[in-house]
From Swiss-Prot:
Function text: Catalyzes the hydrolytic cleavage of the carbon-nitrogen bond in imidazolone-5-propanoate to yield N-formimidoyl-L-glutamate. It is the third step in the universal histidine degradation pathway.
Protein name, as recorded: Imidazolonepropionase
The EC number(s) this enzyme carries: 3.5.2.7
Binding site for Zn(2+): H78, H80, H248, D322
Tagged with keyword Cytoplasm: yes
UniProt-recorded Gene Ontology molecular function terms: imidazolonepropionase activity; iron ion binding; zinc ion binding
Keyword annotations: Cytoplasm, Histidine metabolism, Hydrolase, Iron, Metal-binding, Zinc
HAMAP family: HutI (MF_00372)
Binding site for 4-imidazolone-5-propanoate: R87, Y150, H183, Q251, S327
Record text on cofactor binding: Binds 1 zinc or iron ion per subunit.
Gene: hutI
Organism: Flavobacterium johnsoniae (strain ATCC 17061 / DSM 2064 / JCM 8514 / BCRC 14874 / CCUG 350202 / NBRC 14942 / NCIMB 11054 / UW101) (Cytophaga johnsonae)
Chain residues that bind Fe(3+): H78, H80, H248, D322
Amino acid sequence: MITLIKNIQELLQVRQTSISKVSGAEMAELPTIKNAFLVIKDDLIADFGSMENLPEIKADSIINASGRVVLPAWCDSHTHIVYAGNREQEFVDRINGFTYEEIANRGGGILNSAKKLNETSEEEIYEQSKIRLEEVMRLGTGAVEIKSGYGLTVEGELKMLRVIKKLAENYPISIKATFLGAHAFPTHYKENKAGYIDEIITKMLPEIAQNKLADYVDVFCESGYFSVEETEKIMQAGIDFGLKPKIHVNQFNSIGGIQSGVKFNALSVDHLEIMNPEDIEALKGTETMPVALPSCSYFLSIPYTPAREMIKAGLPLALATDFNPGSTPSGNMNFVVATACIKMKMTPEEAINAATINGAYAMGLSETHGSITKGKKANLIITKPISSYYQIPYAFGSNLIEDVLIDGQII
């Protein structure tokens, strides 16, 4: 099956040779081709270039993209799409003055989601989650990481990971699974934190590894949740079972989680709303991708990740949604890109790089996703007719997507 997309007004994120990520000043550079064509063979990008160099092609399908921008589908490297029910009451509680921490301390927050999840059947969780997955695909996401972390019991965590596996089997979107048993301490372990960590290490991880249910291990390293020492213990156990770490750090406090992530060669460190100079310094020259979650900052009215300082320091940065029922009930990467520009003062070029190639890196997919490169997955966004790609963050409330292709097929 050969598909030709022709007369593309502008083809974005064109990389003749594959790159893994972009950092620092390079993030401001977004290679493009104006008046372009793109050829898809089956599920892969086969060729692209300027229309004046279009070779003779016998295409099975032709898409005329006149006036439209084509770019790689978004790569959302941090989500909690699999959950039961919602936490809309907590949304109203916050409006009425309760903080995220206060809600958590009275049984809300993550523990509320855990209660709902453990009371809901695996089939029902799948049915609820697939609706959210289909929504983010329509919004232009072509690769997504999904975490567990609302089970907080052996069976609850396994149930979540089985749902993630079933979604990956039933949908063309690329899905990476992350085990986040260390999301919070269950109520019955509040006075026995070591006991819960032991359960994660001796009961959850062996089952997960044996059944190949996860690619990564995550920990919520934060005051009132998991300490640096506890985080390191769980990361090491995950590594021993073949799971690379990617961890939650610096959402509310800087307690040394970034340094621990780097020490254990974490694929990514995510949130980063609170960053001090030592945290930025610790990330320099490492293989660990910093990931910002601006929709979470928007929804909780907390600080935004200091993108300008980080990019100025030469760091790479990825953007993701943090789609979850409590702090970011949205999987819209278009809004993430716009919010990064508006609130974090990233340029459109930086934000698109962060949401494509750097997002792919943050879930181990940069060899196959995140750029227009021959041999990569044909996961694409075709916009509606727009004046330029600046419209994507500028018209932040508009749906500018005409078509989404995953594995070369319009969804």
